[in-house]
Curated annotation (Swiss-Prot):
GO CC terms, sorted: cytosol
Superkingdom field: Bacteria
Record-linked InterPro entries: Hist_DNA-bd, Histone-like_DNA-bd_CS, IHF-like_DNA-bd_dom_sf, IHF_alpha
Complex and partners: Heterodimer of an alpha and a beta chain.
Sample GO molecular function, one term: structural constituent of chromatin
Taxonomic source organism: Brucella canis (strain ATCC 23365 / NCTC 10854 / RM-666)
Family the UniProt entry places it in: Belongs to the bacterial histone-like protein family.
SUPFAM superfamilies given in the database record: IHF-like DNA-binding proteins
Gene giving rise to this polypeptide: ihfA
GO biological process: DNA recombination; positive regulation of metabolic process; regulation of DNA-templated transcription; regulation of translation
Protein name, entry field: Integration host factor subunit alpha
Role summary: This protein is one of the two subunits of integration host factor, a specific DNA-binding protein that functions in genetic recombination as well as in transcriptional and translational control.
CDD domains: IHF_A
Keywords: DNA recombination, DNA-binding, Transcription, Transcription regulation, Translation regulation
């Protein structure tokens, strides 16, 4: 299933090719967008990108975990975690692409 990892530079290059901004402007635009998303998430805001996904910060309570080597109970401190929930549109696109690839390999 391996695929390429898309980097900030790849996103900037795509903006450059599709929008027609200079490479410098494209890179700056990508940075600005990512900075805005990061700032919102850090501030505890939910970021919803329609037809893509929702990013949300969630508080997790303290709980008891277990050291897998010793079996000893260990407290896991409360913390904040970020969640990513793909939209139904994105899930459908992933499923369709998977089915399309399966069809090619099975023939």
């Amino acid at each position: 299933m391996g695929g390429k990892t898309v980097t900030r530079a790849d996103l900037a290059e795509a903006v450059y090719r599709k929008v027609g901004l200079s490479r410098t402007e494209s890179a700056a635009l990508v940075e600005m967008i990512l900075d805005e998303v990061c700032d919102a998430i850090v501030n505890g805001e939910t970021v919803k990108l329609s037809s893509f996904a929702t990013f949300q910060v969630r508080d997790k309570n303290e709980r008891i975990g277990r050291n897998p080597k010793t079996g000893e109970e260990v407290p896991i401190l409360p913390r904040r975690v970020m969640t990513f929930k793909a939209s139904n549109v994105l899930k459908q696109r992933i499923l369709q692409e998977h089915q399309k690839r399966q069809g090619k390999t099975s023939k």
